[in-house]
Amino acid sequence: MDSKNIHWHKVADYEEEINFSDNNIAVVNANGKQVCLGKYNGSLFAFAYKCPHAGGILAEGWIDAIGNIICPQHRYKYSIINGRNVSGEGYYLTHWPVEKRDDGIFVGVFS
């Protein structure tokens, strides 16, 4: 990943102002794009709003005990580390880096 090609977009001033659902997933706006923000073991990660398989809304899914994102539509599982489908179907979930800084929470979008 070449950090020169990342454009950082502020999505919140503080983590506490992010409206996480009971499933530890929130929807935020990063440069006009709906992005899911997940929270697992104290870390934040960003991933696509829709599942690449059939367009299920991932904000309505959940994060399992080992940190995979689960689509509510067909239960496809995606790694929060690399976006790979761990269910074996070969799909890839777009994901972006997240940084907690003194001046806010930022999602890095690749150009």
Can you describe what each PLM-predicted range is?
Residues 12, 74-76:
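Intrinsically disordered, low-complexity segments enriched in small/polar residues
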Residues 51, 71-74:
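Short cysteine clusters
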Residues 77-111:
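Short Fe-S-cluster ligation motifs
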Residues 1-64, 97-111:
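N-terminal pre-ligand scaffold of iron-sulfur
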Residues 61-67, 86-90:
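Short linker/helix segments within small regulatory modules
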